[in-house]
Amino acid sequence: MHKTNSITICVPKMTVFETAVNLELWPRILPHYRYIRYLERSPGRNVVVMAATRSGIPISWTSEQIIDRDRVEVRFRHLKAFTKGMRVLWTFQEVPAGVQVEIKHDLAFRVKILAPIADKIIGDFFIHHIANKTLRCMKSYVEANTNKVTA
C-alpha cells in the first residue's frame, strides 16, 4: 500500500516542521486526534501511542517517531496492530506559494491475499482520510497562528 497526501501551507518552513514534530500539540489542533501518549521520549526519537477517530470509529496505533532536523523530515514506523511495519515520511519543500507538506505512507500487508481489501479499508478509508484531515487542520492552525508558533 502506498498513499500520498499533500498540501501547501503559507507559513515559514520551520514553523510547519516544528508544529508537525510537536505531537503533544496534535490533540489540541487536530480534532480527530483523541490523544497522544508517550512511551519513550527524547529530542530526536519518541515512541507514542496515537489515537484518532474516523467517522466516529476510534482507532489507535503505536509508532516510533524520528525527528530529522538536518533533513527537515519526520519519520514514523508503526510498531503494532494492523499497520505494523508501516513507514510514514513527512517532507517539507519550499515552493513559491509557501511550503508543500507531503505525507507518504508505505505498508506491505502481511497477508497478501487480503491486500486489495485491506488497501481499501486501511489505506483509503482510514489512512488517506486521516492524513488529509491532519494536513487541512494543521494548515488552518499554523496559518491562523503564525505569530504565535515558535519556529
What are these regions (language model features)?
Residues 4-6, 60-64, 87-89:
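Well-ordered beta-strand positions in beta-sheet-rich domains
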Residues 6-10, 37, 51, 66, ...:
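Generic structural detector for well-ordered beta-strands
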Residues 1-44, 148-151:
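Hydrophobic ligand-binding cavity/cleft-lining segments
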Residues 78-132, 149-150:
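Beta-strand/loop substructures that line and gate deep hydrophobic ligand-binding cavities in soluble
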Residues 12-18, 126, 130, 134:
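Short amphipathic alpha-helical segments
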Residues 10-13, 70-71, 95-97:
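Short loop segments at secondary-structure junctions
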Residues 20, 50, 88-90:
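A generic structural signal for ordered secondary structure
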Residues 27, 37-83, 100, 132-151:
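Glycine-rich portal/gate segments that line the openings of hydrophobic small-molecule binding cavities
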